[in-house]
Amino acid sequence: MEGSKRDIIENSNNGNNKGVVIEELGETYYTNSKPSTSADCKYFRDSFEFGSNNNNNNNNNNNNNNNNNNNNNNNNNNNNNNNNNNNNEEKSNNETEKTLESNGDTTTTTTTNNNNNNNNNNNNNNNNNNNNNNNNNNNNNNNNNNTNSSNDIYMNSPSSTLSSPGNAGNNLPIGCTKPNVPKSPYSPSPPHLYKSNSTSYLKSSFFSGNGSSSSSSSTTTTNINSNNSNTNTYSTSTNVKKNNSNTNSNTNNNTNGNTNTNSNSNKKNINSNSSDNIIINDTADIMNRRRDRFKSFSWTIGESNSNSKFSELSMISSKCKSIKSEFTPLFETLTVFDESDKIRHSLIQNHYKTLLIQNPASPNRTLLTNLLQRRGHNLTTCPIDINHVLQLLQKESFSLFIFDPNESIINNTSNSISSNEPISLSSSSSYYNNNNSNNNSVNNNNNNNSGNSTNNNSPSSHTPNSPMIFQPIVSNICSNSGGSGNNSPHHIDNNNNSNQQQQQQQQQQQQQQQHQHQQQQQQSSSTTATTNNSCTLNQQQQQQQQQQQQQQQQQQQQQQSQPTTPTQSTQSPTTSISFSKKKNLTINTSFKTSPMSSPKSFNKPSQSPQNIFNNFSNTYNPNNIEFCKILKSKLTEFETVIVLTESTDPSEFCQYIDAGATDYIPQPISPILLDLRLTTCQKLVNNNLHLKKAESLKDATRKMVTCIENSPDCVEIWDPSGHIQYLNLAFSEMTGFARWELLGKEFSNLIDNTEIIPNMWATLTDKKTWNGFIRTRHNNNTLIYFEASISPVLDQFQQILYYNCTKRDVTQKRIDEESKTLEQNKIIEKSRLRLSMMSHDIRTPMSNIIGMADLLLDTSLSQHQHHYLEIIKNSSNTLLTIINDILDISKIEAGKLDIDYESFDFNATVSQVVESMAQRVQSKGLELLSYVDPKIPNILIGPSSRLNQILTNLLGNSLKFTDKGEISICCLLNDETDSEYEIKVDVRDTGIGIKKEALPLLFKAFTQAEGTITRQYGGSGLGLAICKELVHLAFNGEISVESQYGHGSTFTCILKFKKFLPSDSQNLLPASSPLQQQQQQQQHQQQTQFHQHQQQTQFHQHQQQQLQHQQHQQHQQLQQQQQQQQQLQQQLQQHQQHQLQQRQHHQQQLQQQQHHHHQQVHLQQQQQHEHDAQHNQHIQQQQQQQQQQQQQQQQHEHNNNGHHNSHGHNHHGSHHNHNHQHNNNNNNITINKLQHQEKKQKSNEQQLESITENSFSPIVEPMVISDPDTPEALNISQSPSPQSIHNGTTINQQPTSPLNTLGSKFDFSGAKMLFIERNDTSRGNLFKQLLAWNIQLELVEDGESGFRKWKQSIESNSPYSIIIMDLNTPGVDGASLPMRIKKELELMQQHLQQQQEQEQQQQQEQQQSELQKQPDVENKNSSQNNDNNNNNNKSNSSGGNQCIYRSPIIMLMPIQFLNSQLEDNLKDAGVCAILSKPIRMSQLADVFMMYLGPNSEHNNNNNYNNNNGNGYLNGGGGGGGSVNGTGNGTLQVGMSNDGGNGCGVVSFWNKQRRASAEEQEQDPSKLLGKVLVVDDNHINIQILSKMLQTVGCEVDSVLSGADALAKINQSSGDSYDAIFLDIQMPDMDGFQVSRKIREREKKFSLPRVAIIATTANVFKEDQLKCFDAGMDDFISKPIKRAEIKEIIKKYGKNGNHQSGSAYSLYKLS
């Protein structure tokens, strides 16, 4: 219906009114026969496909009486009748096909059957004619009603009218009515109908308005006896559902030959005639049902809009209250999805695969295939073979299975069919249609005449005219595509044949079936399975003729061989149904359908043939049921199985449902019906897929939960706030608490060691995983230790959902570890004691050997003896080094390595290591180079001794495996943080290299790369192992190696040092190593692990205290910062005030100077006027005396060289204007100088102010600021109070930056240097350093190139400020290159002098010639004075331009080449300084400051010459070199020839030599007087005594501590200056002796004596014991001379010894 709702017309009382029953999902509605308009039925046209189908073919049961005398004729007539019937049926079928294909308007198909029977009685007996006719009509009506089991309404009329047979074909419109229909005896449909999720579709049936007749459709049958022919007219009707079935049995018994008995009975056939979707509920409440229920249906059957269907089904389900229990599964399945998950037709594609189980020749194949492909199914087909299906299931999975058992050939193992005989049916009562027929009319014809009887084996029963021969497989080719075959009425004759006859018949039938099967295979190969699978008429006739001929021959043979029995009766022409050996039934090729029956059992004698074929269709086969069961057993509950069936019997449906089918589709298969069912199945499949996923998820969740619950470890889940949400069973077992006791509480209740909570919670809130140990108390108050791992679980937005905590009980493991640790500590203590004893025992004899070797070397020995002693000493030192390495690695492994952190000079430490290794490296002919990044600060905090050890081991390793080339060490600043520096140290060599496979073994103890290396180079293999451990423990760094075999190796260390701060110098104490800290923490935990317990309140208090403490610290820090800022502000204010005062003072000074200058100028002017007056007075006198003194004046002018005095006096008669201008110029120069000094002073003040503002570190180092004008630069020292800056004085202030480096200390801007070096690495390192000092550097590789460069610089008037050359550079050859430069300078000087002499001679000649030409004396005098002045200026200018440039030369040479003879030669060649290689940058900086700095020594004795602005030294003078300011402010150095030596300054090496000579001149006996040596070893006493005697000490010795105390008591008047005391002595050790001495001094108030401990122990504990016992210092054995000298300087008479000085220094370090 469209637009508006349809009103239901009340039921009419007219009994002739007919209506349509419309049902859906168990509810029945009725339509009236008279609608208001034809448009009301538009939903029929819109919702259904139109077509005509002969659903009801009414056949009259004509009882043919055959006489005994006319058996042959009857047989012939039967054959003829069969032929005629076949022809008529073929024609009717053809007509029906045409009607279906066309769009005609007729709905009635008439079929005429002419049965030419000569002896046919059409009217039956006279006494029962009316009854028989009525019965026949009723039978026909029943047949029609029962055979119409369609589920769709087929209409051809465009006017939407249905043809009603009850009105003799009148077209009646359909209206709505509610007739009085008796209550249906049927119960509601079984639950499986709703379980299948089938959609709602219409089922309609006509009914009688008054309810007097149980038939809803009538059939008019006309029997015409004309020329022995019967004409039957059948009228088709719509598909009608019948509740009551009528069974009509006609029996004709006549003693004369014809007896007709007609019986009409109305029976309730419960098990028959029920379509799978035809559901009729109790109709008593039909009148009371709501009308809007029917109107709400949107009539969208067959449409693809699944959303509307879904809404309709949801609406219907809400109103089906009466079938709520049955509809619930479907309702829950369909309503489980929300709006976004609704199933749409376009989205169902490719969601699942479909398996179509069907024989290739099935009539439904094309329809199903096309429909499934159109709906987007991934379709796979296979025959009905369980093995084939199972193979497919193993390969892939399917979600939908469609099983079509029609025309199937399946192995049957059941014994339900025991008879092999064909079943004959009466041809007169036979009919066929396209639907299932469940009413069967059976005629039992019993003839008493035995002579003319015909049994089932007679040829007449198998005549070609029989239309109901069931043959195997043939129907697969010629069946109708519209639906499966239907059951037809069957006539069964009772046979009394013997067993032998039955066996023969079975054999013959088997042969026939095999032959027919072969023919069908040949035909099926040439035909295709289309929607219309019908064969042509010629093919059908040929097949029928062949089959009939074979059957006739077989029957004739049987009749000849076997006589008929008296009980056999003659029959009219029949249709045979044959059961093959395989128990499968098929039909003849002449039929559109294949009526096929499979009775439940033939073994029941009481069951009539009518009941046998009345209940089951041809698709019901026990093998099909078994197949369905087997298929379902191999599937899961989520796969859907649909069965195609021909039956309308609910019992058969139940069989398939019970066998595992989800749904079924009855015949005939309509595209609309199939599409609806597939839509429902697709929904079900989709739901099943969701359910399958849900089930798998549920299973996985169940497994996961089971695993977590039964896990042996504790599993906890916390919410983001830290509250416990879940605990597994293991928690209760381990802790003894019930889970409910702790659920919802904070996790801190489970932690006993609450000190870990802040760090843990900070890690977790930072979204990181925390791993550690948690201590928990058991319910019985015992401690439990857990190894825990807690990780946050994040969502897609990286937000914390919850925390997952996993704990493992490690209590027993922890107890075992603690016991093992205690045992190991005991063992370590014992081994440490043994190691200490062994160290003393080993080092003592080694120290004796080395000491004696040193003493012997000081005696007069031969060359060979001296060589032998050197070998002994070197071997002893090597052995001592190995012993020290063994002790170090033992201490490292024991965790007792001492690491002392102190402030030290990094550059000095590296330089000391390099210098100590230089002689060994250079003795092998190798080059040792070092470079320290200028950015690295001088002062760092770290273990300097361990740095020394690491560098020594690395350099020693490189030296061992390098025979040629070089070894270099490079230190770079890798990174810098707020608190530390990261320095990268690279040690490179050009040795043998290391193979790749040996690199992993390189840093292991007692291992080397190859075994042959140990034999060739020696060594213990401990050096690199110790380096690795020291780098990790002492510097928290890393060490790595890169090597190329045969080309050398590079060892890289990353070391971390702390920054030096002023507070560190006061609070710097020896810090323990990270390993020791870890051990101390472990010991502390071991001591307190069983005694710490805090409650939850304590945890909160602890947190609050921490917060308060943090706030307090922050407040203090803020206060400190504020105080510091205030101090800085105060300092700045003071400094600014001081600057203002200085500026005012400078201004006052400038004003005074200017005032003084003005006064001087005024005085000079007055003097000048006076002088002019006096000059005018004496002009005449001068003119008279001029001629006489001319020669004297020329000589005097030549000597003075035109020099003018500062007061402007001119004794040579210069003009007054000239003198006045000269004075003005001098005044201007003085004023300019003062202004320039003022500007310079202001710039220095601004620079100092910026230094003060930007300084944050109190580290104070001198800084050189180059100044071209002032003779002295600013020198910043450590004093915080500023001083005046006037006249080059120094001030004390903070440095420019907190980073105090060697590069930041010096600035030599403008200096130009020439470096002559052959080694590329050395040139590169020096180039980097000099760039930091702002020096312009030029590099050359040999002496010849260096000489050319130097000469070019001289010629271009841009000489080098300094020259550095290597002694081993080619072309230098020791002193040859400096000597060559010196000679070249001498030649240049001589040439310059000659030029000057020539110029002077020329000037004298010019002057004499000019004097002679003067006319008068006055003019001569004036011109002479002018010429003299000009000549003086020229000579002055020429002398200033021609200078001798002598650059300072610095020579680099290896230490091993240093000797006095070479030094003297280099000095004579003009070398100013000699530096040993490798170069120490601090020494190089000192040399540069000596020759390039503003405070250089030779600058103090030189005068500035600013006449021409170039500032070069005049070569004519005899003064020394000077540093002068050029026009551009650069520094340049000139050096004069000093008496032939060419060096006017004291050289650097002379300073060193003088310092060493001064040290040697000091008397050692004056440093330390009387000394006491206490030792229990005679050899040690001899060695130490001899060393002390060599430095001039008076030595006393004793062998025990008691003797030492006695000796000290005896010498009370003459006390000792120092006591060298051994620690380990038998009777009284050194600690006791030292305490006794200190007690004695305190008791008698004696002066403190220096006590120096001599010990072979190197452990820190022993050293601390020495200081605690009152000792002042210690010396480790073996004792060296250098250490003795240092002790003498420190504690001698002239030393700065104080009480406990060594101990205090040790504490600070």
Swiss-Prot record:
Polar residues bias: start-end ranges: 149-170, 585-610, 1244-1257, 1275-1298
Provide the record's note on post-translational modification.
Activation probably requires transfer of a phosphate group between a histidine in the kinase core (transmitter) domain and an aspartate of the receiver domain.
Q: Where is the composition biased (Basic residues)?
A: 1204-1221
Q: What class of enzyme is it?
A: transferase
Domain (Response regulatory) spans 1312-1492, 1570-1692
Which UniProt keywords are given for this protein, alphabetically ordered?
ATP-binding, Kinase, Nucleotide-binding, Phosphoprotein, Repeat, Transducer, Transferase, Two-component regulatory system
Any idea what job this protein has? Acts as a receptor histidine kinase for a signal transduction pathway. This protein undergoes an ATP-dependent autophosphorylation at a conserved histidine residue in the kinase core, and a phosphoryl group is then transferred to a conserved aspartate residue in the receiver domain.
Protein name per UniProt: Hybrid signal transduction histidine kinase L
